[in-house]
Regions:
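Short, surface-exposed "cap/lid" segments of acyl-processing enzymes
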Residues: 3-79
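Secondary-structure boundary elements
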Residues: 17-26, 55-63, 105-120, 138-142
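Structural beta-sheet core signal
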Residues: 35, 121, 146, 201-202
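Conserved alpha/beta-hydrolase "nucleophile elbow" surrounding the catalytic nucleophile
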Residues: 37, 123-125, 205
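Short acidic/His/Gly/Ser-rich catalytic and metal-binding motifs that mark active-site loops
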Residues: 73-84, 154-156
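Alpha/beta-hydrolase active-site loop
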Residues: 78-114
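Primarily recognizes the serine-hydrolase "nucleophile elbow" in alpha/beta-hydrolase
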Residues: 107-161
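The feature captures the conserved acid-bearing segment of alpha/beta-hydrolase catalytic domains
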Residues: 156-215
C-alpha cells in the first residue's frame, strides 16, 4: 500500500549555497551541512528558521541542504504535513522511516556530486532520529549531530497517544511490546554507527516534555 502513495515518490530539498550554483564560484569547496528538521517539516520558512541558516552560512562558511522527509510538506499524503509518519498504520511508519534512510543517502550522494569533500548532518527531533539512522550507513560523514532525538517511537506513542486509541490498540493485541518489536527494524538503536565516536554528537532538553530525557539517554 505504501508504494501506492504518489507524493512521497518525489524527493524535495531546500538548498542554500554561495552564489546559488556553480562549483566555479568556490561553493563546492565549502563544507556542506545536511539539516533535518522535525515532525511536520516541509515549509521553507519554518525549516530554515530552526537552524539559523545565515549564521551557518556566513559565520561558519557552510553550504546547507534541508531535505523534506517522506509524508511531509510537498510529499504529504493527507491534509497535515507528517500525518502517517508517526500516527495511523504502523507499517506506514516503518516504510516511511526506511525510505527516510534511503532518501538521506541519496542526498549525501547528490552533495558529493556537487564536488563536496566534507559533509556533516544535523537533525532535530525526528531529524535527530534520522541523523542517527544515516550515521549507521555513511562512514565518511564529517560529523553527525543528533539534537533532541526521539529514539523509541513506540514508547513515545504510549506516552502521548490518546488513551482511547491506545486502549483499542491493546484490545486488538497491539500493545507497547508488539509495537516496539515492529519498529526495531528501523531503529538506530539496533544499528552500529559507522562514523567514529569523536565525530558523533547528541544533545537534549532536561525538561523537554515532547522528547523526554530518557529518549536521549537511550
Amino acid at each position: 500500500r505504501y508504494l501506492s502513495y504518489v507524493p512521497p515518490r518525489t524527493a524535495h530539498a531546500w538548498v542554500m549555497r554561495r552564489n546559488g550554483v556553480a562549483a566555479a564560484s568556490g561553493s563546492a569547496e565549502r563544507p556542506w551541512l545536511i539539516c533535518i528538521h522535525g515532525y511536520q517539516m516541509g515549509m521553507p520558512l519554518v525549516d530554515f528558521g530552526a537552524f539559523r541558516p545565515e549564521w551557518l552560512q556566513k559565520k561558519l562558511g557552510l553550504n546547507l541542504i534541508l531535505p523534506v522527509l517522506p509524508l511531509h510538506g510537498p510529499r504529504k499524503i493527507r491534509r497535515v504535513s507528517g500525518d502517517g509518519m508517526l500516527s495511523g498504520d504502523l507499517l506506514d511508519t516503518v516504510h516511511a522511516l526506511a525510505q527516510t534512510a534511503w532518501d538521506l543517502r541519496r542526498v549525501v550522494s547528490w552533495v558529493r556530486a556537487q564536488g563536496a569533500t566534507r559533509i556533516g548532518v544535523f537533525g532535530l527531533s525526528l531529524g535527530g532520529y534520522s541523523t542517527a539512522l544515516l550515521a549507521a550507513f555513511e562512514r565518511d560523514l564529517a560529523c553527525a549531530i543528533a539534537g533532541i532525538p526521539a529514539t523509541d517511537f513506540a514508547r513515545l506513542s504510549w506516552r502521548h497517544g490518546p488513551p482511547d486509541s491506545l486502549r483499542v490498540a491493546e484490545e486488538l493485541g497491539i500493545g507497547l511490546n508488539e509495537t516496539s518489536d515492529l519498529k526495531r527494524v528501523i531503529s538506530p538503536l539496533v544499528l552500529e554507527p559507522q562514523i567514529p565516536h569523536e565525530r558523533r554528537y547528541i544533545f537534549g532538553g532536561s525538561a523537554d516534555q515532547l522528547v523526554p530525557p530518557d529518549q536521549v539517554r537511550d
